[in-house]
Amino acid sequence: MLDAQTIATVKATIPLLVETGPKLTAHFYDRMFTHNPELKEIFNMSNQRNGDQREALFNAIAAYASNIENLPALLPAVEKIAQKHTSFQIKPEQYNIVGTHLLATLDEMFNPGQEVLDAWGKAYGVLANVFIHREAEIYHENASKDGGWEGTRPFRIVAKTPRSALITSFEFEPVDGGTVAEYRPGQYLGVWLKPEGFAHQEIRQYSLTRKPDGKGYRIAVKREDGGQVSNWLHHHASVGDGVHLAAPAGDFFMNVAADTPVSLISAGVGQTPMLAMLDTLAKEQHTAQVNWFHAAENGDVHAFADEVSELGRTLPRFTAHTWYREPTESDRAQRLFDSEGLMDLSKLEAAISDPAMQFYLCGPVGFMQFAAKQLVSLGVNNENIHYECFGPHKVL
């Protein structure tokens, strides 16, 4: 526990942190990668270049300082970050490196004096121990499962299937021929790659896209403009190639009773965790209402449409609605969509009126903000809305 003086000293630095903003974390990362370049093998350098990770770390530091005397308020954020850390195989000793550079950054940018640095050192130590303890639990849980493992495990690609102009699915099976650990629908897989020509090892998290079967895993990857890993997977990865995988993880998952109605709301590649949820609901013959609401640019980039239809037909109470923002003439001729333009949930108010319904959202942050605002305006409780951000977390 932190003493009152330490808490007061840390909280007194909040105005300085807010005034400095993400420049603080930019300095921190630049310093850390200069002194410990081996960490470039772990961090997503694309998120470093676009600033997303720097903004996310700043928000986390500011949130910790603001809630330092109320750590339970931070536990949801701790769980989200700890789950992601296990996908990167973060180790306790790496927290010492981060702590060293965080304190050095505070000293170099603000010269706040030893009392402030000591207070932040104590505060960081408490938070680091919370993460280390929770991550140790997750590592143990993953290794103890049937088909589970520690660290990373070699797999090979056994299927590569284009699903749209931008999305391709990949299926993996373990090289050792053993079983693989189950996961909760909505969780992701840690994919570790360092192909020829990559400056650093790259680690990405991709949502699992079907119900666990104990034999292997399936993900689906959108080819991003300028995306190093997604373009390599689309253009160079082949059936038979090897990859290393970290065990499934993530704090976003579906956990509902058979009589709980569910709405799965997505845009673009945000449908990937929803596919695992829908597959699970279908395989378990979910008896309550299931809604599948999806938005895409047009039919060229709309993936898994046939699979969703097939799964939906097996459910006793299923409603699907698809929006195309800019449908092609072919889309119109084939009637591949239900509505044109942006997703408008007010048209389907009757399908989402049950107060017990749980809503799962995934897609671009702007889309999720747009959809969540509509749901709240239609009377949905915020507690019933669950969402996943691809990349560093953002608050809707």
Swiss-Prot record:
Active site (UniProt): Y95, E135
Cofactor detail note: Binds 1 heme b (iron(II)-protoporphyrin IX) group per subunit.
Globin domain mapped to chain residues: 1-136
InterPro entries per record: Cbr1-like_FAD-bd_dom, FAD-bd_FR_type, FNR_nucleotide-bd, Globin, Globin-like_sf, Globin/Proto, Hmp, OxRdtase_FAD/NAD-bd
Record key words, sorted: Detoxification, FAD, Flavoprotein, Heme, Iron, Metal-binding, NAD, NADP, Oxidoreductase, Oxygen transport, Transport
EC number of the protein: 1.14.12.17
Annotated residues for binding of heme b: H85
Descriptive protein name: Flavohemoprotein
Organismal lineage: Bacteria, Pseudomonadati, Pseudomonadota, Gammaproteobacteria, Enterobacterales
